[in-house]
Amino acid sequence: MRGKLLSFSLFGESHGKAVGVLVEGLPPGIEVSVEELKRELERRKGIERFATKRKETDEPKILSGVFRGRTTGTPVAVIVENRDVDSSYYEEIRNTPRPGHADYPAGIKYFGYNDYRGGGHFSGRLTVGVVIAGYFAKKLLEREGIKVRAYLKRIGRVEAHVSPEELLSSENPYCPDEGAFEAMVEEMERARKAGDSVGGIVEAVAFNVPPGLGGPWEEDIEADIASALFRIPAVKGVEFGLGFGLAELRGSQANDPFVLKDGKVVTETNNHGGVLGGMTTGMPLVVRAAFKPTPSIYLPQRTVDLGRMEEVTLKLRGRFDSCIVPKALPVVESSVAFVIADHLLRRRAWEGMVR
C-alpha cells in the first residue's frame, strides 16, 4: 500500500520460507516492543475452534529500521517464517482451480509460473505483514491520542449493536455485544459441522481523529481507506457511516447537524461516519468491511480440470478456516490505522509550512 508519505509492501508466499513486509516513511524515534508486536500477531490467529489447523508461531524478526528499541527513520523490514507447511495436497489439485479462490486468474496472469501452494502470494497468510505495518502505524497514532478499534459487526445473519463508547470500554476481544457474540459462535459452529463456511462484517472505529485530514479527489481519505480494505483477501464490500443505508433516507434525515459541545464543533449524529468531502470531521471515523465466506470448504464443488479441459467435481482436503472474520479484526484495524497515519503526516507537513 502506497500512501504519499507512508507506505508498505508485502512479500512471500503461503508455503514459502517466510512472509514479510517493508515499511517506508516512518519517522525516527517511535518506540517499538517486540512483545507488543507478537500480541498483535496473536490476535490474527482468531478463534481456535474455527481457524485453520495450521499452527504457526509467528515470531517476528526485525531485520532493519529499528535500533535500541526505536525506529531509525530508515525502511523497516520484518519477516515471519512459515514453520507449519504441508504442500503435498496442492500438487494433486494444481490443474483444478478452487472455486472462490484466485487460482484461475493468477495462473492466467503469471502464465502458470505462480506459486499455487496454499494460494501463494494471494493467501491470507500475507496479512501477517499488514498487521506488522499496522502496529507501527498504531504506535505513531498513539502519540496523537488516536485509537482504532474493530469488532465483529455480523457473522452470517447474526448482527451486533455496539456504541462507540461500548467498543472502547469492552474487554471482549471480538464483540462487546455478548448476546450477539454467543449467537455468532453458534453460527460459526453450524457452518463448521456442515463442512461449510460463513462470512461476516467487521466494523472499525477510529477515535480522536482530528478534523481536516484528507481532501478532494486524489486526497480523499475515504477512498484511501476503502482501497486499503479492498486489498485484504476476501473483502467484497466497504461502507462508511450508514453507507448504503443513506440511499433510503431524505436529506433532512441523513444530514448530521453541527452543534457546539464543550466549546468544540461536533455533529449531533454521525450518519456519514466522520467523513465529508473526503475529509475527516473530527467525529469518530466509522467504516465496515464485508468478508465473503471462506472459499475452501469440505463440500463437493464443480470446477474444470485444465489439463484435460473437462468439468469435474472437486472435494477439498486440508486445513481450512470455517470463518476467517475473527482473524480479520487486527487486519482491518491495521489497514485503517496505516491510512490515517499517512494522512496525519501529510497534515503535519502542511501545518509546519503554514504556521
From Swiss-Prot:
GO molecular function: chorismate synthase activity; FMN binding
GO cellular component, one term: cytosol
InterPro entries, A to Z: Chorismate_synth, Chorismate_synth_AroC_sf, Chorismate_synthase_CS
Binding annotation for NADP(+): R44, R49
Catalytic activities: 5-O-(1-carboxyvinyl)-3-phosphoshikimate = chorismate + phosphate
TM region positions: none
Biochemical pathway: Metabolic intermediate biosynthesis; chorismate biosynthesis; chorismate from D-erythrose 4-phosphate and phosphoenolpyruvate: step 7/7
EC number in record: 4.2.3.5
Single GO BP term: amino acid biosynthetic process
Pfam families, per the entry: Chorismate_synt (PF01264)
CDD domains: Chorismate_synthase
UniProt keyword terms in alphabetical order: Amino-acid biosynthesis, Aromatic amino acid biosynthesis, FAD, Flavoprotein, FMN, Lyase, NADP
Enzyme class at the top of the EC tree: lyase
Record: residues binding FMN: H121, F122, S123, G277, K292, P293, T294, P295, S296, R319
Cofactor(s) needed by this chain: FMNH2
Cofactor annotation remark: Reduced FMN (FMNH(2)).
Function: This reaction introduces a second double bond into the aromatic ring system.
Family: Belongs to the chorismate synthase family.
Protein name according to UniProt: Chorismate synthase
Species of origin: Thermococcus kodakarensis (strain ATCC BAA-918 / JCM 12380 / KOD1)
Gene label: aroC
